Amino acid sequence: MTDQRLRQNGVNNVLLAYSPGMEPNSVEEYLERYPGDDMIDVIGTDIYQYDSLQYKEQLDKELAIMTTIGKQHDKPIALTETGLEGIPDSTWWTQTLLPIVSKYPLSYMLVWRNAREKVTHYYAPYPGQASADDFVEFYNSPKTLFIGDDFELYK
């Protein structure tokens, strides 16, 4: 198993996330195949938007479930994969995503890849893309923190 191999080789800078790839309706359902606190560092979920209302409702429900689990198991929670393919909604970042994720203690959030070989298969905006200006607004929100932001984590 990957975990054993990492430990055998002295690798201690990798976090393992449990993201079951399902749409749980309860804490119990989410934890059905949970391997245990000694194996997992981060509680996560992968959820993509196909329908706006359904995505918002499911994301809110899953993050609430994960927040409960994170507190019970003393684990950080993360949105390990999310996004809207092609991001055709020009306000997706601030009107769909931000209002929900800002309600929860997420340690991080990751949008899926931008595929060079597939012109419309992307999840992060690029200059001139329909949601690019909204992403800048999302980036500048006091509710978000990016790796390049100036913050004092250890002070």
Over which residues does each language-model region extend?
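Substrate-binding cleft of secreted/luminal carbohydrate-active enzymes
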Residues: 75-155
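Extracytoplasmic/secreted cell-surface and envelope-processing proteins
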Residues: 25-29, 51-55, 87-90, 118-121
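Aromatic-lined carbohydrate-recognition surfaces of secreted/lumenal glycan-active proteins
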Residues: 2-29, 74-88, 111
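Substrate-binding surface in catalytic domains of secreted glycosidases
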Residues: 45-68, 75
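Alpha-helical scaffolding within the catalytic cores
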Residues: 20-35, 57-69, 91-99
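Extracellular/periplasmic catalytic domains that process cell-envelope and extracellular macromolecules
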Residues: 9-11, 34-39, 70-72, 102-104
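Aromatic- and acid-rich polysaccharide-binding/catalytic face
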Residues: 30-56, 112-114
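Short, non-transmembrane amphipathic alpha-helical segments
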Residues: 1-2, 97
